[in-house]
């Protein structure tokens, strides 16, 4: 990629992604450029007419190649949004689906409708911890347990819990086995 303004670079990356059938190529291009240059959205927008620094172009080219090869954008950027919060994700965990946010909403609604003051919630196969952490943050009186068979996934979940300031009890194990011995689990 030759020397270009930020705006021209966005257009060039958009065209490249579009040529390979990447859905929403313009958004992908802007996000990949921000990732490569470590810019905020505000910085990117306020510098559209400036020349893009060339020192990070190889990084950008690598990121674009990964996206063209269909690597999920969230794995490339290392983050995803879930329930209005940013969670770290990588290949050790599945990317939380937007539909899973409904599970959080329904769990909260269920607890409120039942009038459970101090609910105990279990998230089996927690992955990134997005569901467990979101429930814990939305219901501070809840005691939340999260399990996963993968120690690597639990590292990601624990990192997210620490970053978002919540206490979820994480344990490694297969399905509900690690929750045996706990008294009543409400959800």
What is each stretch, according to the model?
Residues 185-187:
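Conserved small/polar residues in nucleotide/adenosyl-binding loops
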Residues 166, 182-183:
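Structured loop/turn residues at beta-strand edges in well-structured enzyme cores
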Residues 2-77:
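N-terminal auxiliary segments of SAM/dcSAM-dependent transferases
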Residues 26-27, 116, 165:
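Short secondary-structure junction motifs
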Residues 48, 57-140, 144-159, 170-181:
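SAM-dependent Rossmann-like transferase core, predominantly class I methyltransferases
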